[in-house]
Amino acid sequence: MDLIYTVYLEEWIMKEYILKNGKKLVIRLAEEKDAEGLLVHINQAGRETDFLGFGKEGYDKDIEDEKKYIKSFTPKNFMLVAVIDDEIIASCSIGAREERIRLKHMGNLGICVQKKAWGIGVGKYLMEYALEKAKEGGLTKVNLDVRIDNEKAIHLYEKFGFEKEGTIKKCLFIDGVYYDNYIMGREV
């Protein structure tokens, strides 16, 4: 699970790791060419868990929407992809509201990991790199929200210094049931 080496990709670094299962993991900035693979990944993850803001019904974006989003990246708004065997198996985005003077110091983090990549270090490495890039990009605070019964994710976030800052009541509505989410945050 050690960092093998880094390769500069424009101003971003592509990082490579060996995971607990012996596979090589590459983490890098998402590129336009990833649009279709990202949608496949996101829809797969949505079928595997009810902890995301979308589920088996699918993600409501198409390839062109995803390309447009990728083209809009800035140091405060970006998405990292985690790739194993040329397949995107996880993603992590940070988005700041740069158009709002009083909010542009703060980003919102979202992470999506396919089931086959659970428990092997992918989420940890994505979080490390995303928080590093958020700080480099000028953010001073990162927030996220997580379903209150997603204990594994909450544990990961707490390991990274996130603290519970509040609760969003009835945040998710899944199969006729409302679920609350915690708001968690940390300084970077």
Across the structure, where does each feature detected by a protein language model lie?
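Conserved GNAT acetyl-CoA-binding A-motif
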Residues: 127, 134-145
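Acetyl-CoA-dependent GNAT
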Residues: 20, 58-116, 127-128, 187
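Short glycine/proline-centered loop/turn elements that form peptide/ligand docking sites
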Residues: 127, 150-153, 170-175
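Short, Lys/Arg-enriched N-terminal segments with co-localized hydrophobic residues
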Residues: 2-13
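Helix-loop element at the rim of GNAT/NAT acetyltransferase active sites that forms part
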Residues: 40-57
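Hydrophobic adenine-recognition pocket in adenosine-nucleotide-binding enzymes
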Residues: 30, 113, 146
